[in-house]
Amino acid sequence: MSNASTVETSDVERIAVNCSKSGMHNYIFIAIPIIYSTIFVVGVFGNSMVVIVIYSYMKMKTVASIFLMNLALSDLCFVITLPLWAAYTAMHYHWPFGNFLCKVASTAITLNLYTTVFLLTCLSIDRYSAIVHPMKSRIWRTAMVARLTCVGIWLVAFLASMPSIIYRQIYLFHDTNQTVCAIVYDSGHIYFMVGMSLAKNIVGFLIPFLIILTSYTLIGKTLKEVYRAQRARNDDIFKMIVAVVLLFFFCWIPYQVFTFLDVLIQMDVIQNCKMYDIVDTGMPITICIAYFNSCLNPFLYGFFGKNFRKHFLQLIKYIPPKMRTHASVNTKSSLVSSSLSDTKRASKKIALQMTDNEEHCK
């Protein structure tokens, strides 16, 4: 069992008796809590710095900074629950924190999954609009639209997390006196639970990733048509977002695979204890890999974002925002020529210069 456990009440005897040792390995109970604790410390520090830098220095004036701010907040809300999961795993999957915290900590996982993937999708669409359709997109690529989009993302992610709020609860195995935090459901709800698990695979990963992949493919094609020197001016934020997306993919794909295997177990397609053990052992490991996404994002911002590095150094040197130099995201002098060329190449060049002046927030 793990923090992704499911318990079908009509099937407890099979789980508790026939496959009672699945996933119960000493190295899991030692290594996983250490990893969770490390992610907690690094994630809280890193994402807190991102929130402070963007809010205090960058003032959330651009579309990208608003999305990145919400991404950091999502990661921060999630990583603060990791000490609970670390203790839960260290105690051999025994949950002593009560039903309320079981629901809250579980909901934070699902909420983080959906908000992260939706925000990354919006970032890729924003980059696509800014680079491929720079003139037309200026109408809707505003801070207000970005804020409303983020509100919508949080609402949709919260609705997608409702099964955790409703079905996640503590369950006592009387024969072992073990209290677990798991999704508990009647056999009549099996197809609903399977549907929710598949939604994580399809809505929470596959569809958004296809949108992201398409967006960046079209962006790459467009960038080939402009001058290399001009492209370099837009590389900072482009490289950073691509890195964030790739990190998300490689961190979450193992978890998505094991979630699908868990669906097959729930549907009785897989019916042997060896596979139960593989899934129950692999699930906390893949969850750890997925959780690394929440603590590594801030370091990507610092590595790829020149302005972010500058503001971060100002922060750790205790330089107040009002005293900082004013070479900020909106103060670069425009290089746009006074007249537009009739050719497509010149039009794109000018548009990208304008975009860089407005959007170079990193």
Swiss-Prot record:
Lipid modification (S-palmitoyl cysteine), residues: 361
InterPro entries listed in its UniProt record: ATII_AT1_rcpt, ATII_rcpt, CCR1-9-like, GPCR_Rhodpsn, GPCR_Rhodpsn_7TM
Superkingdom to which the source organism belongs: Eukaryota
Membrane topology classification: Multi-pass membrane protein
Pfam families named in the record: 7tm_1
Entry comment describing in which tissues the protein is expressed: Expressed in lung, liver, kidney, and spleen, with highest expression in the heart.
Compartment(s) of residence: Cell membrane
Major location category of this protein: membrane
Family (UniProt): Belongs to the G-protein coupled receptor 1 family.
Cellular component GO terms, alphabetical: external side of plasma membrane; plasma membrane
This protein's name: Type-1 angiotensin II receptor A
Membrane topology (Extracellular): 1-26, 91-99, 167-191, 268-277
Cytoplasmic side: 57-62, 127-142, 218-238, 304-362
